[in-house]
Amino acid sequence: MAKAFIGVGSNIDREENIRAALKALCKSFSAVVASKVYESSSVGFEGDNFFNLVVGIETELSPRELQDRLHEIEADYGRSRGGPRYVSRTLDLDLLLYGDMVVDEEDLQIPREDVTRFAFVLRPLSELAGDDCHPVSGKSYAKMWQEFADEEQKLWPVNFNLLSQAD
């Protein structure tokens, strides 16, 4: 079994879609754990605020199979691919990490660059895997969050536990 981390986000019917995503992830994978949920402004476009969190899972799927399964879940909840990258989303499920694997292919990058670029990914990841180390930099995610320097990316914790409501 491999430990993987998935970034989860939505800015369309956020609560409903995040809950649905968590239900689908709990049905598909074992040892599902979730970070706190954060609200953040959209990045790269003008749009409604997002809810974001990171989910840890254990899986026997390969990274490619896992990415394909995440795309299936997104499609089940109205996500269409092939359009502009920065747009409002019903559901966004991104494979962030897969064990300590490093993959750099056209349509699959592990670790996902978002881990080092966006507060809405790094902060919740540091909650779940703070002592784990980035497979390229070797720094712990807690240390990376402590050193994160982008003051423009504001996050607000959402005051409820979505995982318990997803069961």
Positions of PLM-derived features:
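Flexible, gly/pro- and Lys/Arg-enriched active-site loops
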Residues: 44-50, 64-67, 72-167
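Short, surface-exposed acidic-centric catalytic microdomains
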Residues: 20-66
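Short N-terminal binding/cap micro-motifs at the start of the first secondary-structure element
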Residues: 13-16
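Extreme N-terminal starter segment of soluble prokaryotic enzymes
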Residues: 1-5
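Short beta-strand-to-loop capping motifs
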Residues: 8-10, 55-61, 97-100
